[in-house]
């Protein structure tokens, strides 16, 4: 999709673009924020058992676990 410099457009072209955008937006299905928040919360809660950020990563499968041992020179 080409980049359009709005400053180079005529007023008629700007208004046409605005009308086109509004036509697209009017067809969008809208939902109440409260309903969406409930659905997102339910989705997260259903999958929280599988989420490594919630339940953690088992030590044997943690790729970032610090290696044991080493040498300290004083």
UniProtKB/Swiss-Prot annotation:
Propeptide stretch(es), residue numbers: 72-74
Source taxon at top rank: Eukaryota
Subcellular location: Cell membrane
MF terms in GO: G-protein beta-subunit binding; GTPase activity
GO CC terms of this entry: heterotrimeric G-protein complex; photoreceptor disc membrane; photoreceptor inner segment
Modified residues (Cysteine methyl ester): 71
PANTHER family: GUANINE NUCLEOTIDE-BINDING PROTEIN GAMMA SUBUNIT
Entry function: Guanine nucleotide-binding proteins (G proteins) are involved as a modulator or transducer in various transmembrane signaling systems. The beta and gamma chains are required for the GTPase activity, for replacement of GDP by GTP, and for G protein-effector interaction.
Protein name: Guanine nucleotide-binding protein G(T) subunit gamma-T1
Name of the gene: GNGT1
């Amino acid at each position: 999709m080409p980049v359009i410099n709005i400053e180079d457009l005529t007023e008629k072209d700007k208004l046409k673009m605005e009308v086109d955008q509004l036509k697209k937006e009017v067809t969008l299905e809208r939902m109440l924020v409260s309903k969406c928040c409930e659905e997102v919360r339910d989705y997260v809660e259903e999958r929280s058992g599988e989420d490594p950020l919630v339940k953690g990563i088992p030590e044997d499968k943690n790729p970032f676990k610090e290696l044991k041992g080493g040498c300290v020179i004083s």
